[in-house]
């Protein structure tokens, strides 16, 4: 057993070193890209694509006319095979005043180049999973609700930038993402429902297949993979959740060391770890449990948020206390039910309530942000104190 652990440890170190020294399959002189459209976004006169070719790559195309843009909107779909000619570039480091490092962001997604498209050709040989996703998008289009894309597919491209910025500034941007909480809520409900019909082993197989399909539909985000993997493994085998979480964390970093630059990746794991090790504090009635969950998540995420933005919203605990139940237990389930049944009016009613409360609280409060300007070294100390030490303490 000891030898096996040593062999496993050495193997992981070798894989990590290999990934750190990984060289892109494209080169600086590439003028042709062929692959599958995995993601796309229309942004003004620009079409931004994530294409799965030799490896994942971002490709940008600029429209000459409004008519050309509208034509592409009608014909572009997920899963189409695309043939591109143009020029390849290394992504820029920083692109805005907040010093958002675009290159590191792309590296965290294992993207090494950006391709500027000059000529584009599309073919419609789409596989089954992408056909399902395109069918979902077509149904969502009928609702004309930008939030529905976020709640069902984790796609926030349809939500206006100022609204997304308000969510981020107020510490509730996770409500627009397919978080671990949503995955657990959705598939735990499905698992419990199947338990009344099928045997346990059959249930796990069915849920695993459906979970994989859903993870594909939402783009295999790190938080959804983390939550989905933990959900299935904990159903199959009794294992300490924090050990499983740390194992998944390190496996992610071995697969892609640049994930350490991803704020969403760090927040997902750190907040989940805190909720696990302090689960004994989350007791009592519904209000107390929700309050403690928000407080623990706030304490866990604060060092990372301050390090990235040099500011923190002190009201985010109360905002989460208000909006998490509304989104997670009413609007999120309604989003799925609306696709199956004629519940558009009910869904719209609760979305209107949410928007009214959100706008009233956010825009009537001129001092909702409490900026904390701190040096990077102090932020590192906070991360050490509040995030790293608890992890080390639990392991020891």
Explain the meaning of each model-derived region:
Residues 9-174:
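Membrane-interface helix/helix-cap signal primarily in integral membrane proteins
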Residues 2-7, 14-27, 38-39, 43-45, ...:
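C-terminal regulatory/interaction regions
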Residues 4-10, 115, 164-317, 377-396:
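Hydrophobic alpha-helical transmembrane segments in multi-pass membrane proteins
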Residues 129, 133, 137-141, 319, ...:
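Membrane-interacting alpha-helical segments
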Residues 130, 160-170, 309-319, 359-376:
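Juxtamembrane membrane-water interface segments that cap and precede transmembrane helices
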Residues 26-27, 51-52, 115, 136-142, ...:
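Alpha-helix C-terminal capping segments
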């Amino acid at each position: 057993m000891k030898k096996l652990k040593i062999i496993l440890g050495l193997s992981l170190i070798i894989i990590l070193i290999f990934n750190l020294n990984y060289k892109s399959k494209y080169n600086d002189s590439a003028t042709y890209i062929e692959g599958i459209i995995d993601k796309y976004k229309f942004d003004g006169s620009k079409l931004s694509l994530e294409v799965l070719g030799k490896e994942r790559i971002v490709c940008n195309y600029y429209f000459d006319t409004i008519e050309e843009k509208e034509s592409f909107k009608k014909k572009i779909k997920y899963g189409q095979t695309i043939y591109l000619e143009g020029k390849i570039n290394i992504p820029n480091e920083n692109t805005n005043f907040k010093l958002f490092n675009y290159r590191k962001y792309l590296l965290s997604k294992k993207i090494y180049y950006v391709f500027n498209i000059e000529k584009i050709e599309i073919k419609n040989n789409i596989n089954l999973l992408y056909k399902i996703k395109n069918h979902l998008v077509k149904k969502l289009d009928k609702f004309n609700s930008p939030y529905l894309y976020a709640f069902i597919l984790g796609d926030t491209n349809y939500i206006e930038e100022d609204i997304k910025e308000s969510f981020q500034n107020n510490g509730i941007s996770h409500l627009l993402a397919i978080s671990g909480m949503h995955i657990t809520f959705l598939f735990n409900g499905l698992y419990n429902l199947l338990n009344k019909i099928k045997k346990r082993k059959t249930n796990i197989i069915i849920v695993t297949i459906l979970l994989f399909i859903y993870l594909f539909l939402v783009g295999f985000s790190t938080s959804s993979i983390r939550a989905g993997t933990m959900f299935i493994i904990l159903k199959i085998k009794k294992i300490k959740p924090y050990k499983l979480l740390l194992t998944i964390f390190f496996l992610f970093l071995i697969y892609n060391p640049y994930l350490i630059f991803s704020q969403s990746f760090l927040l997902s794991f750190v907040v989940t770890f805190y909720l696990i090790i302090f689960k004994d504090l989350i007791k009592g009635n519904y209000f107390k449990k929700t309050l403690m969950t928000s407080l623990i998540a706030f304490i866990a995420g604060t060092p990372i948020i301050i390090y990235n933005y040099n500011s923190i919203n002190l009201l985010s605990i109360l905002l989460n206390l208000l909006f998490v139940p509304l989104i997670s237990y009413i609007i999120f389930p309604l989003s799925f039910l609306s696709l199956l049944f004629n519940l558009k009016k009910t869904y719209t009613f609760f979305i209107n309530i949410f928007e009214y409360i959100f706008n009233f609280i956010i825009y009537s409060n001129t001092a909702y942000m409490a900026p904390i300007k701190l040096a990077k070294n102090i932020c590192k100390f906070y991360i050490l104190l509040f995030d790293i030490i608890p992890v080390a303490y639990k392991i020891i």
